[in-house]
Curated annotation (Swiss-Prot):
The keyword DNA-binding applies. Changing residue 381 to N: In a breast cancer sample; somatic mutation. InterPro entries: Znf_C2H2_sf (IPR036236), Znf_C2H2_type (IPR013087). SUPFAM superfamilies: beta-beta-alpha zinc fingers (SSF57667). GO terms for cellular component: cytosol; nucleoplasm; nucleus. A zinc finger (C2H2-type) spans 507-529, 535-557, 567-590, 776-799. GO terms for molecular function: DNA-binding transcription factor activity; DNA-binding transcription factor activity, RNA polymerase II-specific; sequence-specific DNA binding; zinc ion binding. It is found in: Nucleus. It comes from Homo sapiens (Human). This is Zinc finger protein 438. One of its GO terms (biological process) is negative regulation of DNA-templated transcription. Keywords: DNA-binding, Metal-binding, Nucleus, Repeat, Repressor, Transcription, Transcription regulation, Zinc, Zinc-finger.
């Protein structure tokens, strides 16, 4: 009886297929532009669903729909039959027969193995994608853009309207429990339609899980009398000749019809364009009007990634088989997808029942798909951020370049402080645009082009890498304009993947690895390694490594804004504006030390301390360069008081109180030719004397190149006990008295007997000045001459001296010895 009854509905179903197709195509007219995308994935889906699951006890015509369903779901152990509803002619119901063993279990591992081989390694599991993790198993068979999908969708309600005659079937109570939720759900949201569809699909996967989700009210799985009415309502949406069979209330019929139409639109739209499934399900259903928050967009992107991954899984599961049967499969697979999307919304016992059914269908792949779902959800969120940040960075790249250049000009302080503020401002700007300018649709075309999990994983990892690089690009590294003293590594191109950093002309020192922005800074820095001082002061000849140091020196010591007393060197006529510089010049160049006396009142003019005894003359070199700086400091500290300068020879430690006397000493003792006419009106520091002595400065400078070495001299206490007579002989000119010999009349003898005999007889006249600041004294005729050469010429022509130079040496020697002898007697 079943065969005879089932044949007419089959014919009717085949005849009514075009009408159902027309109805579904009307719903697809709004989405017709996506119809060209689906055929790209058709071959993989068609080959993956050809499973020989025909029931042996049913005819091919009657089992066409159920067999296709069993192929789609992989339920080879379940057989179906069309039963006529009692008391209703022309109304049939699809009845599930007892489980029969088939070759399907053999195909299960074959379906799961290739999918497991292509699953990516899960890396990140966001907490809010717990629901999405249960959605992934449903997306195994999502996409097959076949042309007969609408017909298959309408053929299922046609074959299923008959009420069941076997209430003892296993999965009958579940659809019955879930039917009220279908009637109670609102009719305007596609999410509700998915929920209702999922209720039936989750609880009766062995029966007709694929078609039931698409047309939930049309699934005849309960024995209650309300099922025929619900089934008639479903048939009303697909077929016109079932309208008279409706027995339920009008509002529920209208609601169920709206739900069915929305589900059909979503199904066909996802069949034709898998990338729009997330938009059809999520954007239309859950997003309210007005501003769109971030979480809905992240979920939508997650759904899109799920769809793409499911396509790859279908490609992995593809098996050879005829394409004619696969043309009717795509719409049924979408029902299975819609059924599992609401798995998390079901009660606990229902979810457990659903998990049991799914484990019977494909147990090994469920866990892997869950992991992949979590991975894809996290990747979709990060990829969404990656799509937004580059646009903003490209928009602000010009401003950032100008900002960096300005900061490099401002200086070190602002370069270190302002970049952080700019980075915070930039982050705030990006965050603002991220919340108000989401563009999830722009992500869909790029993700839809992926064909395998490997490529998806690679792109996903690339997105993570770009996200990390973009985060790093906002750090202070991108402000790489360090200053001279910065020890950071040499800047490189921080921005990759299309973002190139601003190259800066950095120069590195190969010795200490320091970096400098300007080449001139590097040159000045290299002078510190070579001890080269190319910048010297033209006034005091002090040299520096950097030009800035020389500028500072000129401002401090030789600047015109400061009122200074310019000091001229007595030997080389150089001008100095600072007392320390002048003293340093005398020590280094002319070997003359300037010091002070302990106290002006303690010593009388006749008791002025002398520096050195003639007995220790041979030890000149051992005491030359010590304590010079200390004496300078004493002079500077006490220069406010009335002190007497002591000009000491740095070689023999002889002290004088005028530069003229020390010049004569250098000329006589050390043989330094200092040309200059020292007249009575001249004084230390006079310009005439300085100009005459300029030419003698260079040889002395070359003979003594060492600089800055301190010289040691006797302290003031030692000076008080050393040679007071020599000091008196050299400094009697300060009192304005020139001691000359009273015994006139030159004698033919030498000056030595005259000195020796005059000394004991006249102790007050035993001392005389052979030379003074006023000139040279002739001991023979008491004539004053201005220069030594004049004195020697005078001796030669006036006094007929054969060797004036020898006479000068003898007089100089006797004079020194006589002074020493007289001083010893005076002390007694």
């Amino acid at each position: 009886m079943q065969n005879s009854v089932s044949v007419p509905p089959k014919d009717e179903g085949e005849s009514n297929i075009p009408s159902g197709t027309i109805q579904s195509r009307k719903g697809l007219q709004n989405k017709s532009q996506f119809r060209t995308i689906a055929p790209k994935i058709v071959p993989k889906v068609l080959t993956s669903r050809m499973l020989p699951c025909h029931s042996p006890s049913r005819s091919d015509q009657v089992n066409l729909g159920p067999s296709i369903n069993s192929k789609l779901l992989g339920m080879s152990t379940q057989n179906y039959a069309l039963m006529q509803v009692a008391g209703q002619e022309g109304t049939f119901s699809l009845v599930a027969l007892p489980h029969v063993a088939s070759a399907q279990p053999i195909q299960k591992p074959r379906m799961s193995l290739p999918e497991n081989l292509k699953l990516p390694i899960p890396r990140y599991q966001p907490p809010r994608n717990s629901k999405a993790s249960r959605k992934k198993p449903i997306l195994i068979f999502p996409k097959s853009g076949c042309s007969k999908a609408p017909a298959q969708t309408q053929m299922c309600p046609q074959m299923s309207p008959s009420p069941p005659h076997h209430p003892e079937l296993l999965y009958k109570p579940s659809p019955f429990e879930e039917v009220p939720s279908l009637e109670q759900a609102p009719a305007s949201i596609s999410t509700a339609a998915l929920t209702n569809g999922s209720d039936h699909g989750d609880l009766r996967p062995p029966v007709t899980n694929t078609h039931g989700s698409l047309n939930p009210p049309a699934t005849p799985a309960s024995s209650t009398p309300e099922e025929p009415a619900k089934q008639d309502l479903t048939a009303l949406s697909g077929k016109a000749h079932f309208v008279s069979k409706i027995t339920s209330s009008k509002p529920s019929a209208v609601a169920s019809e709206k739900f069915k139409e929305q589900v059909d639109l979503a199904k066909t739209m996802t069949n034709l364009s898998p990338t729009i499934l997330g938009n059809a399900v999520q954007l239309i259903s859950s997003v309210p009007k007005g501003k769109l928050p971030i979480p809905p967009y992240s979920r939508m992107k997650t759904m899109e990634v799920y769809k793409i991954k499911s396509d790859a899984n279908i490609a992995g599961f593809s098996l050879p088989g005829p394409k004619a049967d696969c043309d009717k499969i795509p719409s049924t697979t979408e029902g299975f997808n819609a059924a599992t999307k609401v798995a998390s919304r079901l009660p606990v016992p229902q979810v457990s029942q659903q998990s049991a059914c799914e484990s019977a269908f494909c147990p090994p792949t469920k866990l892997d798909l869950n992991h992949k779902t979590k991975l894809n959800s996290g990747a979709a969120k990060r990829k969404g951020r990656k799509r937004k940040v580059p646009d903003e960075i490209l928009a602000f790249q010009g401003k950032r370049r100008k900002y960096i250049i300005n900061k490099c000009r401002d200086g070190k302080e602002r370069v270190k402080n302002d970049p952080q503020e700019f980075r915070d401002q930039k982050l705030g700007t990006l965050k603002k645009y991220r919340s108000i300018m989401p563009k999830p649709i722009m992500v869909i075309p790029t993700l839809a082009s992926l064909a395998s999990p490997t490529t998806l994983q690679s792109q996903m990892l690339g997105g993570l890498g770009q996200d990390v690089l973009l985060n790093n690009s906002l750090t202070p590294k991108y402000l790489g304009c360090k200053q001279d003293n910065s020890s950071s590594p040499k800047p490189s191109s921080v921005f990759r993947n299309g973002f190139s950093g601003i190259k800066k002309p950095w120069h590195r020192c190969h010795v200490c690895n320091h970096h400098f922005q300007f080449k001139q800074h590097l040159r000045d820095h290299m002078n510190t390694h070579t001890n080269r001082r190319p910048y010297s002061c033209r006034i005091c000849r002090k040299s520096y490594v950097r030009p800035g140091s020389l500028s500072t020196h000129m401002k401090l010591h030789h600047g015109e804004n400061r009122l200074k007393k310019l000091m001229c060197c007595e030997f080389c006529a150089k001008v100095f504006g600072h007392i320390r510089v002048y003293f340093g010049h005398l020590k280094e160049v002319h070997r003359v030390v300037i010091s002070t006396e302990p106290a002006p009142s303690e010593l009388q003019p006749g008791d002025i301390p002398k520096n050195r005894d003639m007995s220790v003359r041979g030890m000149e070199g051992s005491l030359e360069r010590e304590n010079k700086s200390n004496l300078e400091e004493d002079f500077l500290l006490n220069q406010a008081d009335e002190v007497k300068l002591q000009i000491k020879c740095g070689r023999c430690q002889i002290t004088a109180q005028s530069f003229a006397e020390i010049k004569f000493h250098l000329l006589d003792v050390h043989g330094e030719e200092i040309e200059g006419r020292l007249q009575e009106g001249t004084f230390p520091g006079s310009k005439g004397t300085q100009e005459e002595l300029v030419q003698h400065a260079s040889p002395d400078w070359k003979r003594h190149p060492e600089r800055g070495k301190p010289e040691k001299v006797h302290s003031s206490s030692e000076e008080s006990h050393a040679c007071p007579r020599l000091k008196r002989q050299l400094h009697l000119h300060q009192n304005g008295v020139e001691m000359l010999m009273e015994n006139e009349g030159p004698q033919s003898g030498t000056n030595k007997p005259r000195e020796t005999c005059q000394g004991p007889e006249c102790p007050g006249l035993h001392t005389f000045l052979l030379w003074s600041h006023s000139g040279f004294n002739c001991l023979l005729c008491a004539e004053m001459l201005g220069r030594k050469e004049d004195l020697l010429h005078h001796w030669k022509h006036q006094h007929n001296c054969e060797d004036p130079s020898k006479l000068w040496a003898i007089l100089n020697t006797v004079s020194n010895q006589g002074v020493i002898e007289l001083s010893s007697e005076a002390e007694k």
